[in-house]
């Protein structure tokens, strides 16, 4: 889909080995990853590595927005350790590897946009959605003077390929009678790069996530938020989900349940100790100011129990199909809430205290 300026192409999922066989050899994986345009980058605490904790490891990739807050806090505080599981982050240089690492078996779970998951699933990767990440919080922000969809024609959009942040501009333009072909698209490598490009004037409009959307409106004088997605998708729309490899679900359900429980505890802490949580995560996991994080707080809440969003997730893939990323709609078997429901049943007190949930 690139005419497209400085395009970071998403790897061809159809050419990848999803068996997990590459996971046993780091060196072998790196050779294969280089051939498909993926490169490994770091491991451990925060976004830049750190000390490990006791317990059997569950390896995970992650994104950068507030929809990742529950897994960030679960990692920072290693809540799953008391249940014998260590949450280990495998960090990546670009958005593409956040997705492909899960498909190729380099990680066990990933917090990712549901659109990216659907592409993996469509390509045959043995993965399932097992829990929610966050809701709402995606936004389109335009530079000063661009205050309507009509003014976006011919302008340069900064986004990420095969992401909800690409699908939202597509849907926004379509709603306003404008073709995606009528704009220029620049696929970015990561959120910090996209944010800085917008600030520097290299992008006319950007689709990004909280806390960065609110930060741009706050930091770039005259910038306009054209939509926060609610007018397109309705209140409480899903952005990111927790996806897991089928092998983890089968071979280590207890470990996966401990991660889901840890994310649930993190959600409760974020809802009840908001300022303390932001102080802990800003800088270490979020590259923005505490002031901007406070402004954005609440615009993309963490929601582990995403069962009420099942139909939304399955129906929103229409746009992904129109864009040519998947060949057929996924069935209901792409989503497995079984372990989430077991965690809810086994932890009624914790679940009962959560502000955001399906029940």
Locate each region found by the language model.
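Conserved C-terminal helix/tail region of periplasmic/extracytoplasmic solute-binding proteins
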Residues: 321-359
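Sec/Tat signal peptide C-region and signal peptidase I cleavage site
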Residues: 48-54
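Sec-dependent signal peptide recognition
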Residues: 31-35
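Short, solvent-exposed loop/beta-turn-alpha elements that line the ligand-binding surface or hinge
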Residues: 78, 82, 230-235, 301-310
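Pocket-lining segment of extracytoplasmic ligand-binding domains
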Residues: 115-116, 192-284
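Short, glycine-/small- and polar/acidic-enriched structural segments
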Residues: 54-190, 194-197, 204-210, 225-227, ...
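N-terminal secretory signal peptides
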Residues: 1-28, 39-43, 51
């Amino acid at each position: 889909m690139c005419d497209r300026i400085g395009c970071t192409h998403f790897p061809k999922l159809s050419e990848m080995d999803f068996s997990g066989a590459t996971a046993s050899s780091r060196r072998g994986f790196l050779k294969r990853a280089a051939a498909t345009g993926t490169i490994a980058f770091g491991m451990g605490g925060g976004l830049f590595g750190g000390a490990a904790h006791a317990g059997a490891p569950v390896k995970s990739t992650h994104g950068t927005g507030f929809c990742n807050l529950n897994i960030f806090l679960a990692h920072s505080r290693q809540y799953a350790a008391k249940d014998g599981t260590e949450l280990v982050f495998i960090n990546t240089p670009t958005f593409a590897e956040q997705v492909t690492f899960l498909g190729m078996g380099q990680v066990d779970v990933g917090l990712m946009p549901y659109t990216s998951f659907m592409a993996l699933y469509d390509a045959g990767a043995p993965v399932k959605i097992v829990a929610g990440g966050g809701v709402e919080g995606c936004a389109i922000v335009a530079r000063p003077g661009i205050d309507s969809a009509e003014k976006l024609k011919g302008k340069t959009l900064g986004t990420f390929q095969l992401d909800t942040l690409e699908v939202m501009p597509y849907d926004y333009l379509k709603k306003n009678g404008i073709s995606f072909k009528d704009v220029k698209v620049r696929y970015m490598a990561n959120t910090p790069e996209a944010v800085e490009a917008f600030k520097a004037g290299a992008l006319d409009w950007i689709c990004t996530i909280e806390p960065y959307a609110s930060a741009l409106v706050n930091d770039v004088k005259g910038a306009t938020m054209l939509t926060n997605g609610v007018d397109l998708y309705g209140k409480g729309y899903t952005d990111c989900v927790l996806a897991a490899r089928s092998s983890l679900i089968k071979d280590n359900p207890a470990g996966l349940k401990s991660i889901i429980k840890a994310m649930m505890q993190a959600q409760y802490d974020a809802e009840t100790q908001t300022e303390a949580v932001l102080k802990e995560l800003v800088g270490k996991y979020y590259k923005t100011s505490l002031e901007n994080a406070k402004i954005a707080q609440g615009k993309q809440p963490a929601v582990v129990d995403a069962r009420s969003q099942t139909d939304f997730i399955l129906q929103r893939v229409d746009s992904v199909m129109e864009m040519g990323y998947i060949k057929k709609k996924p069935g209901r078997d792409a989503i497995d809430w079984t372990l989430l429901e077991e965690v809810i049943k086994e932890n009624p007190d914790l679940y009962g205290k959560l502000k955001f949930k399906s029940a």
